[in-house]
Swiss-Prot record:
Residue intervals annotated with topology Extracellular: 44-56
Gene Ontology, cellular component aspect: mitochondrial inner membrane; mitochondrion; TIM23 mitochondrial import inner membrane translocase complex
Species annotation: Saccharomyces cerevisiae (strain ATCC 204508 / S288c)
Compartments it resides in: Membrane
The keyword Membrane is annotated on this UniProt entry: yes
Transmembrane segments: 23-43, 57-77
Record GO biological process: protein import into mitochondrial matrix; protein insertion into mitochondrial inner membrane
Predominant location category: membrane
Keyword Transmembrane helix among record annotations: yes
UniProt name for this protein: Protein MGR2
Matches recorded under InterPro entries: Romo1/Mgr2 (IPR018450)
Cytoplasmic side stretches: 1-22, 78-113
Membrane topology term: Multi-pass membrane protein
Length: 113
């Protein structure tokens, strides 16, 4: 039975996937930051008329929304520069050279230690 064909390159995530990943990472950081700063503000200044839970929730929601928004936008901006083929004209040549080196190493049993 012949071996299965191997894919040498994996498909990159789409911009929508990068947006969602940035949103989730930013929201997670925002929740942690909101708990820390909100807890500190409540401990030093008191909860105010809304109470502890509602005040802490406001801090968490505000920082989670802000961090999530900026991280998602930043991940899209960062991924736009990689999508243009003219940004790295020698990238295809570099990938071909690596593939040929990999084939030669596999053919002659040369291991990189």
């Amino acid at each position: 039975m012949p071996p299965l064909p191997q894919n040498y390159a994996q498909q990159q995530p789409s911009n929508w996937d990068k947006f969602k990943m940035g949103l989730m990472m930013g929201t997670t950081v925002g929740v942690c930051t909101g708990i820390l700063f909100g807890g500190f503000a409540i401990a030093t200044q008191g909860p105010g008329p809304d109470g502890v839970v509602r005040t802490l929730g406001k801090y968490i929601a505000g920082s989670a929304g802000t961090f999530g928004l900026f991280m998602s936008i930043g991940s899209i901006i960062r991924s736009d520069s990689e999508s243009s083929p003219m940004s790295h004209p020698n990238l295809n040549l570099q990938q071909q050279a690596r593939l040929e080196m990999w084939k030669l190493r596999a053919k002659y049993g040369i291991r990189k230690d």
